[in-house]
Amino acid sequence: ESFRLFDDIPGEILVTIIKETDKTTRNDITRFRNSQNAVKGKDLIALEAFHTGIRAQLSRLGYFYEQQAGGWLFLKETDKAGAYTGHNIYRKYLPAEHENCISSSDAIQCMVAGIFQNPTKPYSSKASFMPYGASYSKIFNDRLEQDYRLLFYPYLIRSYSETIGYGQLDSQPTQKRYARLLFVTAYFKILFDFVLKKTIDEIKAEPKLLEPIFMNFDANKELLVFTESIMEHYFGDAQYHYDSLNAEEEKSVTWHNFFSNYAWDAELQKRLASHVK
């Protein structure tokens, strides 16, 4: 029995055009692409020259900067063991089980929280800081130095926070479960305002100012411990603010919602600074 052919049906197809003459870079871009899947922001990072440069810088330190989902998973075990062995000092900030792979999306999130002093927006919408996201061009523009320190150092601080109980399901107090990025923000606020006494713009223009701090883990550990003590005061202030919000008529705020919208408002910033002083 013959089947009737369907009439022509209009449709659409997504086409990605890669304008890159270097074969190695082309292969990097296409290696993990699956034509059946939609292109996501975290995949488009592979198309960004800025992040390719960061990957090269971090590889010299023994870390794999994963620009594209699957990059680390599909890397040969011999390459992992030979090229990505970590750094003698920087590994002290990381959990013992860390694989020396740094997700670009996590690093971006940490940079916005630390260097740009904004913990709430990257917490509430990680995707907005990916390529073509609403906030990407506000961060990645010609005013941002292509320097691994701007991404790597905030990532190290978030990783350190995990070693002291931040981001865990059973974290106590409960706020610690949601406060990894807030810890990053608090650390860099203390570092910028009270230790280096530099503005955000000055640090962005000269990221090397951060290196002596991070290369001296023992001294920096004291600042990290101090930040943790300040966060204990912050959690008390946050609890009061949280309770006040929920006491308002027709207001129901979860801790997730709190850290997405209220955790770094002007009053809580002022309170944190007062504890430091």
Task: Please place each PLM-identified region on the residue numbering.
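A sequence-level detector for short glycine-anchored, His/Arg-bearing signature motifs
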Residues: E1-F3
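Short glycine-/polar-rich loops that comprise or flank the Walker A/P-loop
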Residues: I9-I13
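C-terminal catalytic or substrate-handling cores of phosphate/nucleotide-
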Residues: I17-L181, T185-V195
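C-terminal accessory/interaction regions of large nucleic acid-associated machines
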Residues: S171, Q175-K176, R180-K277
